[in-house]
Amino acid sequence: MPRKGYTKRQEVLPDPIYNSKLVSRLINKLMLDGKRGTASTILYDAFDRIKEATGNEPLEVFEQAMENIMPVLEVKARRVGGSNYQVPIEVRPDRRTTLGLRWLVNYSRLRNEHTMDERLAKEIMDAANDTGASVKKREDTHKMAEANRAFAHYRW
């Protein structure tokens, strides 16, 4: 408990084109070395590719992808009597979004397509269809939590 109180979390402004805070947060996650213009160009190009490929609204495809990526459970290490246990816990809503965006960007960067906007578009479309590396990461996280269900009573 801090003596001087908690700092208020800074509110993210919605992006100008889709008027979505989630898109704005994705731009921030994509950004390297403070180059927001480059990051937003990559994202909007990826959304154009999604529109061409699926014919659907890219924001809806992205939101569906995020719903398929965001984890509900995760494990946290807890030390009890000299041994560490992986204790399954529920993920808070803000952390769900953060983890989903992080996994989406990281696994997009690991793909083999030529340009980043192509990689991001393919990863978003794969995630919307419940396939892809970021969805696999979520499933692995859920499997870990399920496997360690016996230690759920160590929750704090």
UniProtKB/Swiss-Prot annotation:
Q: Which PROSITE patterns match?
A: RIBOSOMAL_S7
Question: Which GO molecular function annotation, any one, does this entry have?
Answer: structural constituent of ribosome
* Gene3D superfamilies the record matches: Ribosomal protein S7 domain
Among InterPro entries, the record links this protein to:
Ribosomal_uS7, Ribosomal_uS7_bac/org-type, Ribosomal_uS7_CS, Ribosomal_uS7_dom, Ribosomal_uS7_dom_sf
Presence of keyword Ribonucleoprotein: yes
| Function noted in UniProt | One of the primary rRNA binding proteins, it binds directly to 16S rRNA where it nucleates assembly of the head domain of the 30S subunit. Is located at the subunit interface close to the decoding center, probably blocks exit of the E-site tRNA.
Protein name as it appears in the record: Small ribosomal subunit protein uS7
Which species is the source of this protein?
Leuconostoc citreum (strain KM20)
What is the taxonomic lineage of the source species? Bacteria, Bacillati, Bacillota, Bacilli, Lactobacillales
Q: Which gene encodes it?
A: rpsG
